[in-house]
Amino acid sequence: MRPFAIALLGSVLIAPLPAEAYVALMAGQQAKPLQGSFNNVPVLHSNQPEEVHGPGILVSTTPGSAIAAETGEPLANAGYTFNGAFGLHVHHKYYPNDRSRMGSGRGRRGELTLATLLINPGSRPVHIRFERGAVRNSFEAPYLANNLMGVKPLGVRPWNTGPGDATAVQMLRGQLDRKLQDEITIPAYSRIVLFSTQLPAKGIANGLLKGKSDGPFQMAVVAAEDPQSDADLFSVLDQGRLAPGRIYLSRLRQIENGTVFSRVAGVALGDTYEASVSHDLEQGALHVPLTSTNRHNFGTGEVQVNALASRMVDSSLNNVGTYGVRFDVTMNLRGAGPHQLVFSHPTANGRSRFTAFRGSIRIETVDGYEDVHVGMKSGESLPLSSLNLRPGQNNPVKVSLVYPADATPGHLLSVVPDQQLAELRRREELLAAAQAAKKIPSKTATVAPAPPPVAVEIEPITMARPMPQVTPPPQWIQPPPALPTIQGMTPAVISPTRMSQSLLERYQQAVQAQQKLMDSLMGR
């Protein structure tokens, strides 16, 4: 355990949480595993390479192999034949090797066409019906990293925050994009283009689909620059060359031992994760992992990642991102009064905060349902909904989301009393104030100048004027008569003794004033 560093703000001590409690909301509390499960619906994931540098095959489930642009060596396909319910997830970015296609200056950016091909290897036509799905590119759904942060209500027309979020909300609501066909037939021994989309240099494209076939078929995802027809797309598949950008080919051993995750190019088993948990809130707050990983499972040891049925050699070993997977979690709660449903992402140790999630979440209670859009940075805990629990009965709360691409899995879902969230906010404000205070540059310490001498008012000393010498009058002059007493008062007489005492007091005052002045100059 790392040592604690304690910050003092006023009379409040602020200490960072221990390493294992990296979501502040659950400090001193424990998470419990959901113990849910994935279904077995096969889903083709085309996400490796994420950044595509030119034309070629991205992933194919047909038998055989294709030549890697980086090594010139053949790589085995992710062979798989679909039959029945299936899914598709495509997510790629275009960064061309040909710099002239980047559109520097006023030049037009080049475009890459992504296409999904359906192949029927059999002697009978295969009919496919699509239930839900959408395809979006950067033109249709611009990606702005810090747009729409926080929690916002989601109306009939969803927020537009990037291709990954735009397709996920369509899947969450069970809608099929009007640009896609709801039914399609693949003739025997034939292949067709399911969809294609164009993305500009530095652009992103994402597709999510769920369907069901009445027979066996295979799929491939290809990239082409400036194709003129479907035949040009089929030609990419026939040439048998992989698109450049497979940066993990030099790290295959690290993928195998789990030190590098890579991304997914293969078929995952499972398009839905379902779980149910019961909890008495009188015994404490509820914390459960959602989209947990090996690294972020909050002490439960539960990893909510589904397996792959087939994969390219440079693909991750499992569906590590769970992109496109629907999570349905039902919480049966007992308790009373106001509580908060909170969605969190752990603090990023050793790195700056980043956008960890931008997507849509549905919350269902006995009072109905609401959809919200969530934009979250790492280390944040955001309240999704206020819950008013009825005492003495079960209070079911269901949370659903389709995990969007460009998010970082490993979240925590919590139900806590209102005051627990309020206390967290207070601590965050104090910590923010302490951090802001630390950023204020300290001024160079200087020795304060000595204070000026204390001004001492010295009373002036009036010296007695010498008595003039009196010449005695001649004897023949008669002395003047005595002055008469005015109203019974005798003439004033200053005795020599009294005058000497007054003068002494004035001398003493002068000495004391001088002493005070000397003391002040010596800094006493």
Predicted regions mapped to residue ranges:
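Positively charged n-region of N-terminal signal peptides that target proteins for export
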Residues: 1-4
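Bacterial N-terminal signal peptides
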Residues: 7-16
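Sec/Tat signal peptide C-region and signal peptidase I cleavage site
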Residues: 17-21
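Long compositionally biased, domain-poor regions of proteins
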Residues: 22-31, 61-131, 136, 143-144, ...
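Activation corresponds to long, low-complexity, non-globular regions
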Residues: 25-53, 222-290, 429-430, 478-480, ...
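Low-complexity, serine/threonine/proline-enriched polar segments
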Residues: 150-177
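Signal peptide-directed secreted proteins
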Residues: 176-266, 317, 440, 445-459, ...
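Acidic, proline-/serine-/threonine-rich low-complexity intrinsically disordered repeat tracts
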Residues: 432-488, 492
